[in-house]
Amino acid sequence: MKSKLIILLMLVPFSSFSTENNFEINKTRVIYSDSTPSVQISNNKAYPLIVQSNIWDENNNKNHDFIATPPIFKMESESRNIIKIIKTNIKLPDSQESMRWLCIESMPPTEKSTKINRKEGRTDSINISIRGCIKLIYQPASVPSPVFNNIVEKLKWHKNGKYLVLKNNTPYYISFSEVFFDSDKVNNAKDILYVKPYSEKKIDISNRIIKKIKWAMIDDAGAKTKLYESIL
């Protein structure tokens, strides 16, 4: 009996993204501006992989604004391949960035096809599928590349009752690599991972007295900026 297990891995702020067990992506984000972008994936295992690439929106639905090609292919062991991102004719906002997710899923072929025994006397098996997702950010021609020292002035933090409110007055998706409340690093920062253009986020800070916020952003190359500070 065979079952399929999908493990989903999201973005981490490093120069490349590795799923540890299956494949490596050479970027943590894709910026789509003038040219057709691409990512390189590497199969460092001793057996081939079946790889599938798709574009998803922020609500975890398949998206048709972009196409990842090739959509499905086989990677031999110790090999590399390129996935290109192509924009369709669907119109996107031209006054701000738009974001999707490029998700790449891999699964080893059956043992019969690879001639590699990965079981020890078992009659059932589980095909483990690993999915790695990185941000795909569309930057229209009318929106210049971000200058992060200038962006800081347009990110506003303030308290409103039991909430800490972050307002993004820029046309950019702002991603954070780390956030500090006073001197305490926020470890469970899922609500502050990123903020959309011209929007705000509310973070519940019930029973906390916070006087200042420190934060570092992630730039277009996937690198961490310096720490910035706001007094509340």
Curated annotation (Swiss-Prot):
Pfam families: PapD_C, PapD_N. SUPFAM superfamilies: PapD-like, Periplasmic chaperone C-domain. It comes from the Bacteria. Keywords: Chaperone, Fimbrium biogenesis, Immunoglobulin domain, Periplasm, Signal. It is found in: Periplasm. InterPro entries: Ig-like_fold (IPR013783), PapD-like_sf (IPR008962), Periplasmic_pilus_chap (IPR050643), Pili_assmbl_chap_C_dom_sf (IPR036316), Pili_assmbl_chaperone_bac (IPR001829), Pili_assmbl_chaperone_C (IPR016148), Pili_assmbl_chaperone_CS (IPR018046), Pili_assmbl_chaperone_N (IPR016147). PROSITE patterns: PILI_CHAPERONE. Its main location: periplasm. One of its GO terms (biological process) is cell wall organization. Disulfide bonds: none annotated. GO terms for cellular component: outer membrane-bounded periplasmic space. Residues 1-20 form the signal peptide. Involved in the biogenesis of the CS6 fimbria. Belongs to the periplasmic pilus chaperone family. This is Chaperone protein CssC. It comes from Escherichia coli. The lineage of its organism: Bacteria, Pseudomonadati, Pseudomonadota, Gammaproteobacteria, Enterobacterales.
